[in-house]
């Protein structure tokens, strides 16, 4: 992210700031060249010059504050706040599904509501969009490693995100539904989308923003 924009958002006062908050899927991990192929960059091209899209993804980030890499303790959390976004797109939860991080839906809900409240409190009056995690194509096993992403837990998280969106009257972009029948998007490692997958996510976000 260009820090000139982060620390001086008023230089672009006539643009609509879109903060893409998330983990490695938002960041564009495994994509080459990452900055050109990640979904926030594709979204920027679709939205055009009236918008400034910031990629604030953090590889390995969890939504839960007790996770092994809480998003709320990252530099990009601070940068996304200083960006003064008009729109915030939240896509977290994949890394929360790991055995070492998952404490159940109640803990997840509490931290999710806190994150929503944080962005709602910004002077830019951000409109918040929730996103469900992408489908994981890793095979769950009887005795998974503690650091293994779990699709069964991701399904729990997806239901909770949809429920929170309904209760908070927030739009929700269901990326889990978008990707559940597309294993070809995740051929490299079963978790991170390839360029086609990133493009599909960008298109889905674009349609939601233009709705």
Each predicted region: which residue ranges?
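Alpha-helical cap/lid subdomain in secreted, periplasmic
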Residues: 12, 71-211
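Conserved SGNH/GDSL esterase-like catalytic core that processes O-acyl groups on lipids
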Residues: 11, 15-19, 25-113
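Short hydrophobic segments within beta-strands
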Residues: 21-22, 131
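A short, compositionally biased domain-edge/stem linker segment
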Residues: 1-10
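Short alpha-helical interface patches
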Residues: 8, 20, 27, 176-180
């Amino acid at each position: 992210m260009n820090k000139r924009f982060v620390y001086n958002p008023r230089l672009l006062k006539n643009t609509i700031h879109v903060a893409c908050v998330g983990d490695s899927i938002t960041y564009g991990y495994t994509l080459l060249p990452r900055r050109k192929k990640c979904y926030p960059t594709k979204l920027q091209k679709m939205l055009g010059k009236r918008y400034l899209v910031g990629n604030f993804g953090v590889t390995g980030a969890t939504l839960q504050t007790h996770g092994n890499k809480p998003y709320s303790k990252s530099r990009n959390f601070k940068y996304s706040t200083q960006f003064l976004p008009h729109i915030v797109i939240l896509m977290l939860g994949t890394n929360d599904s790991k055995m070492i991080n998952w404490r159940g839906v109640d803990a997840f809900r509490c931290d999710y509501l806190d994150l929503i409240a944080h962005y709602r409190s910004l002077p830019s009056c951000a409109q918040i969009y929730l996103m469900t995690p992408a489908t994981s194509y890793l095979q769950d096993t009887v005795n998974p490693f503690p650091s293994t992403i779990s699709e069964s837990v991701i399904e729990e998280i997806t239901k909770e995100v949809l429920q929170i969106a309904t209760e908070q009257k927030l739009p929700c972009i269901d990326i889990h539904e978008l990707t559940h029948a597309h294993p070809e998007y995740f051929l490299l490692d079963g978790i991170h989308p390839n360029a086609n997958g990133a493009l599909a996510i960008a298109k889905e976000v674009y349609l939601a923003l233009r709705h």
